[in-house]
Every structure is written in C-alpha cells, then in structure tokens.
C-alpha cells in the first residue's frame, strides 16, 4: 500500500472483511482475508487451482488488493469512501447507482444494505484501532512491523 501511495488505513480492511483470517470463506464464496470473489481474483491474476488458491496467500492477495485499490482510487477520483463501497459492492454497481441517483458523494447515496453500512463499519473499526493502539498511528511510525506468531 505504501509503495502505491495508498492511504495506509486501507491495509486494515481485512479486519472488517475477515478478521485477518487468511482462510476465511464467505457465504457467497469469496475467499481469504481480503475476500476476493472468483471474478476479481482472476482479474488480478490470483491463481484458483484445486490444490492452490492464491486468495488464501496473504502476501499475494494483499498485493492484489493494493492493485485493486489503486484502480478504484483512479476510477472514483481518489474518494476513498466511494472506493471502499466499490470494493464491497462492486465498482460497476456503484458507478451505475451514482449515475441513476445523480450523486457522487458516498454519504448522499442510497445503496444496498451491505455497501451502505460498509464504510461506517470500516471507519468505526479504524477509530477503535486508533484508540486501542495509538502507537501504530503516530507521525513517523515505521513503514512496516515485524510480528512473530506461533
């Protein structure tokens, strides 16, 4: 995300998508911590074989998510609320809805329930994270953290 000059907060999105569970599977078939569906995974060259599915690979799926947000940012004029809603509900759905309603502000749009609640849910999660872990957000924080887990 840093290398693509994306807002670093977007790297927290898997908390909303999957609680950072790299093996997560949704009721609609989206997989991995970024919850890529088949079509988007294919679009970003994530292999979906019988033995290996790159949507379960945290590194490959994170790289794909960064590319996807780079594209969404460009498409929605770097309005990250719109980009987040597009990530959740689909960019074509969002663009069509914006055109039908004649609105280009996320907060003015009337969307399906899940994308309508997605941005507030993400912002609430960020607020909780910033209050609980303020040292992750001070100016000049390291560009990466090394975390060991067993």
Where are these regions (language model features)?
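Short, surface-exposed glycine/acidic/tryptophan-bearing loops
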Residues: 24-45
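Extracytoplasmic and endomembrane cell-envelope/extracellular-matrix remodeling and assembly machinery
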Residues: 3-4, 48-51, 55-76, 81-150
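Short beta-strand->loop
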Residues: 23-24, 55
């Amino acid at each position: 995300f840093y290398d693509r000059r994306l807002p670093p907060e977007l790297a927290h999105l898997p908390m909303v998508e999957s609680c950072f569970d790299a093996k997560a599977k949704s009721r609609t078939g989206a997989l991995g911590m970024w919850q890529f569906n088949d079509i988007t995974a294919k679009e970003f060259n994530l292999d979906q074989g019988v033995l290996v599915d790159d949507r379960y690979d945290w590194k490959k799926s994170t790289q794909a998510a960064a590319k996807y947000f780079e594209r969404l940012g460009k498409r929605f004029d770097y309005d990250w609320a719109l980009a987040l809603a597009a990530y959740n509900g689909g960019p074509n759905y969002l663009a069509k809805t914006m055109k039908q309603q004649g609105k280009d502000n996320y907060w003015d749009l009337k969307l399906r329930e899940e994308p309508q609640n997605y941005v507030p849910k993400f912002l609430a999660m960020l607020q909780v994270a910033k209050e609980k872990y303020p040292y992750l957000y001070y100016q000049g924080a390291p560009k990466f953290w090394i975390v060991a887990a067993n």
